[in-house]
Amino acid sequence: MAELIGAEGLSTFFRQHGVPEIVIFAGKGGLGKTTSSASLAFHMAVNESKQTLCFSTDPQASLSDIFERDFYGKGDVELLPRLHVVEIDADRRVADYQAQVKKKIMEMYGLDAVPKEIDEYIDSTSAEPAMYESATYDAMAELVAQRNFDLYIFDMPPFGHGVRMVAMADILSRWVDKITEARTKVAEYEAVAASLKGTKATEDLVLKELSGIRTKIKIFTDMITDRQRTAFFMVLIPERMAILDTERALHMFRELGITLSGLVVNQVYPVEMLDAPGLSNFTRKRIEMQQHYVRQIHQQFGNAVVATVPMFPREPKGLEMLQEVARYLMGEEAQQRV
């Protein structure tokens, strides 16, 4: 006899823990992070009347494809009343940041143009791995700091990029602290020298800039590690490699101070298909394999599983399909049987 699995949906989670200010979906690419993000955003805006912002931090994912409207690089776009979508153009944001750095160098040193060597070095930083992460979490922190929405839903990059993005915040924070410490000592010497000369020390624009960077980093790290404000969900499918990847990712995220709120098991074939006449042997084997791994997920992760979402007969894109996905994600439909 098949038995019900105890994944009651995000509605139950929100009733028990309250609706957070921020929801983050993470996981390996192609498993349903973006679909989960878009479906939850649609549900919370339309059915729960929450002012909701859905933000993609994954350059490979596409909220534009799922919502069937172009958001890329267009800033904050209102899709529906109470539902806004942002898909950042990280390359353009990095280019804008580089332009700001050049402008500040010219202002600080009274230059008409940035010296050629420095200009080339700044341009070369766009190839640095940290630049994308920096641009992305900078955008995330700015959006949350503005406090324009009840709920922020972030679609994180795949595991490797997601972990690196979070780790980079800690690395940059330490780097900024070291530079600030050194710069503060220089500023103290400059102040003493100015006092001896009877002149007034000029404002240290470098320290001011470093302080701004540190503030943004702190906003980001505080945001994703605060369990009162943020719910962190991981999406996986019932396959061996997905389970192993999830284990590794959970370990890495724990080391970075991020606590899992729950798991969403996605793309699960309805077990009722086993009773369908004419079912192919291939499909039967796939369903049986999935049932095995669904059991393993529940045994291994226990009550961490908060929702089970089935495999749908067509691609989950467009508002009608997102509403269907949301019914399972929120737990409004019957749970998966194994």
Where are these regions (language model features)?
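Electropositive phosphate-/nucleotide-binding environments in soluble metabolic enzymes
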Residues: 134, 214, 291
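C-terminal-of-GTPase-core extension/linker across diverse P-loop GTPases
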Residues: 204-220, 242
